[in-house]
Amino acid sequence: MPGGVEGENSRMTSPLRPEDPTRVGDYDLVARIGKGGQGVVYLGKAPDGTRVAVKVMETSWASNSRARSRFAKEIEAASKVAPFCTAALLDSDINADPPYIVSEYIEGPSLRDAVLRDGPRTGAALDRLAISTATALVAIHQAGVIHRDFKPANVLLGPDGPRVIDFGIARHSEATVTATDSIVGTPAYMAPEQVEGRELTPAVDIFAWAGVMVFAATGQSPFHDETLPAIINRVLHQPPRLDGVDERLRPLLEACLAKDRSAAPPRCRSSVSSSATTR
């Protein structure tokens, strides 16, 4: 399969590299979709010809017990979430060499790619995106899962609506935070308590949701800057940049991105949940 976009509304793929596997389990791997911290996501084919997304742990991580444990937690988290809001988990083998996860293949670009290609969302399109992604997060939280890395690249714009993907650093909402896993995520969309390594609640996903909606409306995160230290400083100490955000959404997003985390999350969770139920 040649590199590039398969179609105007498809996900970007690239050819397999010489070091890539061509088959794992019962699945043929035909192209690369993307690469994460510990694994590569491939476009695959099931025995019946159905296209699937196959995440394969890189061999350099496969012998790391902590990495395998995180991979297993990703499988557990994805299996708990209602399939309407994510790419449904189809198969997995944590004991394979290397371990892999097979998910439903969503035909459509990520929100990040779509905004960079077509420009920001406005009007009804932005409203639909806000409500549908809020609905997905409510369902994820109802399953007892905190995503912890909600960002534009992890929202796929499928033909039947947005899907939230990549539960690689998600965990159960009652799990204990440890020093080794507390500070993970994408800085421009991380809540202050996540940056500081404090105890996490579903509120961190609501903060990220607001940041993603700002990106969808403007093409940039509300804490965009040139360097990682500058981004973190903005998250912790500077107000979000909301220029260009629709006035109807702005008060809610501003509240969700507030530095006073003790007051903002309950109000935002209530507002986001209310928005979701109006879908």
Language-model features, listed with the residues they occupy:
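Eukaryotic protein kinase
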Residues: 2-279
